Swiss-Prot record:
PANTHER family: N-ACETYLGLUCOSAMINE-1-PHOSPHODIESTER ALPHA-N-ACETYLGLUCOSAMINIDASE. It comes from the Bacteria. This is SPbeta prophage-derived uncharacterized protein YomE. InterPro entries: NAGPA (IPR018711), Pectin_lyas_fold (IPR012334), Pectin_lyase_fold/virulence (IPR011050), RHGA/B-epi-like_pectate_lyase (IPR024535). Pfam families: NAGPA, Pect-lyase_RHGA_epim. Gene3D superfamilies: Single-stranded right-handed beta-helix, Pectin lyase-like.
């Protein structure tokens, strides 16, 4: 069976989508060339989506990928056209994050918690066809501005004089209107039928006229960022525009340039929603835009588009094995036959940690390769692997393309390196490999020969999640060719002699939500683009991240403590380092940037907390000839916290 389904009301079951609506397995699309003609470039993937998402009974949904050479942006236009008056009235809904819906008293003067929820999670809870981030929120989780849900006032406008959070209001008849802060009192809006409201702003278009004044409410309005906004045509069609940003392909857009996009789409009203890393649009259970954080961001509320409550047809569906339309409607569409899942105990593997499983492992992988891929499931136990007493490359354990290995969880399932294994790699990866719930132990206390736990050459799409990498005599993961889309998530990494993750060259590299301790460098990247290190705990390392001739990096939310050397160093362009905690660096600087071959420029270093008892340690050193640097808003007890 294929991996893409829709509900068939006559058959009362989910059925595969017709093959002609989807690309063949492995088909890839390159981004179209940018043209000077405004608003005209669309990909073949767009055409596929337009066919998939049409439903003539309630509304139609189309999503288009576009480029604008003059503005230097890539963006997505999602249009929702109601087919009936009732659909126009009911299709827009407001969804608060979990805790808001469970515990908030709408009569209270304040509501906010640090708990938030992802756009996709809210979409799945509400079975929404389209879901987008909406209102802005403060660091304590308090939602901004006027908040009306289902005709009930949850929160009034922000204090008089605070003009940032304006209002986008949907009325009982489905009409969308936009207002400045406190332009119309909340009780008057509700008396006129206000049903749901969203707050951020500014409004961009009102009564078919673009905003030309009071565009300085917030300083960032005239700065290029990823942006999310919504508009409405006179016929009730909603137009959602999501602009990518903070990347080589798309620089982002200012608020000043947004009205023209909506006027070109025929909108009579338009409103700027929360943007930046919060800019996220999910259509039929998948994000269609490139999220600038590299991972989805939890938010306080969403604007969702759903079918009527009594309808069971054409709702969004679960995509089998995480496949189907790609997370960006831009690059790749897959149509995949179901792959087998084999329990290794059924194949004669021994989980006692004493008997070598190398031959059986290689045989199982070879058989899965002949079937086009699949999954090996490792129940609880310790599995000894690694050919002993040989240096022959043919004896390496290689995961074929489209093969996954999955354990019970990392504290239950272990792959243990043989004491007499002498090859320089324990596992070799190829394209589209996935490893989850397994501890991979290099057995360095017994086997002293140099060995990388996982290695590969030119790799497309490799992910490790909820695994452990421990006791390696060399690197943890080593990509010595070009690595594209490498994700290391939710890991425990310890006692790795050299780099925990090393990518010689590549793009879209993520180290997120992991704990890394007592090792060399957590992440080493060279000639790489789009590098994300977020929400990691790094303790007692040599270095957290070493960049070499890299660009487009986001490093945020990490706690980095007790490094032997500098926490972050190297050469990187167009990088943001924010909201990290740096403690006890045993070197001259926590952050140390150099020029190397391609140089260091366009750095933003802000919102970090920096503390050290080591005498002589400063926060940051940048090259004297750096272009565009902002080091501000940092706190701590050492010199050079704020250079600008």
């Amino acid at each position: 069976m294929a991996g893409f389904y829709r509900y068939d009301q006559n058959l009362d079951k989910y059925v595969p989508m017709p093959v002609e609506l989807l690309a063949s397995e492995g088909e890839e699309y390159t981004a179209p060339k940018i043209t000077q003609k405004f608003n005209e470039v669309e990909t073949k993937t767009t055409e596929i989506l337009n066919k998939v998402l049409t439903d003539d009974r309630y509304f139609t949904v189309t999503s288009s990928f576009k480029q604008d050479a003059t503005l230097g942006i890539e963006y997505y236009v999602t249009k929702v056209t109601p087919k009936t008056t009732e659909a126009k009235k009911s299709m827009v809904q407001k969804t608060f994050a979990y805790d808001f819906e469970k515990s908030i008293d709408p009569t209270s003067s304040y509501f906010g918690t640090t708990n938030r929820e992802t756009v996709l999670s809210m979409a799945k809870r509400k079975r929404s066809v389209v879901a987008i981030n909406a209102s802005g929120w403060r660091s304590n989780g308090e939602v901004m501005g006027l908040q009306i849900k289902d005709g009930v006032l949850y929160k009034d406008y922000d204090a008089a004089g605070y003009t940032g959070a304006e209002a986008c209001v949907f009325f009982d008849d489905g009409t969308m209107k936009v207002y400045g802060n406190r332009e119309v009192d909340a009780d008057i809006l509700i008396s006129k039928g206000a049903r749901n409201s969203f707050a951020f702003g500014i409004w961009l278009v009102k009564d078919s006229k673009p905003r030309t004044a009071q565009m300085t409410t917030w300083a960032d309005l005239n700065v290029k960022h990823p942006r999310q906004a919504i508009g409405q045509r006179s016929d009730g069609t909603l137009v959602i525009i999501t602009v990518d940003g903070r990347s080589l392909r798309s620089s982002g857009i200012t608020a000043y340039d947004m009205p023209s996009l909506f006027l070109s789409e025929g909108c009579i009203n338009a409103f700027l929603l929360d943007g930046g890393g919060s800019s996220q649009t999910a259509v039929e259970g998948k994000y269609i835009n490139n999220i600038s954080d590299g991972i989805e961001r939890a938010v306080v509320d969403t604007l969702t588009i759903s079918y009527p409550d009594d309808d069971t047809d054409s709702r969004f569906f679960e995509v089998q094995e995480g496949r189907g339309l790609a997370t960006s409607l831009n690059r790749r569409v897959e149509f995949i036959e179901s792959k087998p899942t084999w329990n290794v105990l059924d194949l004669g593997f021994s989980p006692d940690g004493l008997i070598d499983n190398t031959a059986k492992f290689k045989k199982a992988l070879s058989d899965l390769s002949e079937k086009g891929g699949g999954k090996l499931h490792f129940p609880k136990g310790t599995y000894l692997i690694g050919k002993q007493n040989t240096t022959s490359a043919s004896e390496k354990i290689e995961l074929p393309s489209n093969v996954s290995i999955v354990g019970e969880r990392r504290s239950y399932t272990k792959l243990l390196r043989n004491p007499n294994h002498s090859l320089d790699e324990l596992l070799r990866i190829t394209d589209h490999n996935y490893i989850e719930g397994i501890e991979i132990d290099g057995n360095s206390s017994v086997n002293k020969s140099s060995c990388r736990l996982i290695a590969g050459g030119n790799i497309k799409s490799f992910k490790m999640k909820d695994c452990s990498l421990v006791n390696a005599t060399d690197r943890g993961v080593s990509i010595h060719g070009i690595g594209k889309s490498i994700t290391i998530e939710g890991m425990y990494i310890s006692n790795i002699a050299n780099e925990c993750i090393n990518v010689a060259e590549g793009e879209i590299i993520k180290l997120i939500d992991s704990e890394i301790t007592f090792s060399g460098t957590a992440l080493w990247v060279g000639n790489a683009a789009n590098i994300f290190t977020k929400n990691n705990l790094a303790k007692s390392l040599k270095t957290f991240v070493r960049y070499k001739n890299s660009q487009n990096a986001i490093c945020s939310g990490n706690i980095i403590t007790n490094n032997i050397d500098r926490a972050i160093w190297g050469s990187v362009r167009e990088a943001v380092f924010s909201d990290n905690v740096f403690k006890q660096c045993h070197s001259d600087y926590h952050l140390y940037f150099i020029q190397e071959d391609t140089g260091t420029n366009d750095l933003i270093v802000t919102g970090n907390s920096v503390y050290s008892d080591v005498e002589g340690t400063a926060f940051i050193r940048t090259p004297s000839d750096i272009d565009r640097r902002r080091v501000s808003g940092n706190v701590g007890n050492i010199p050079s916290l704020n250079l600008d």
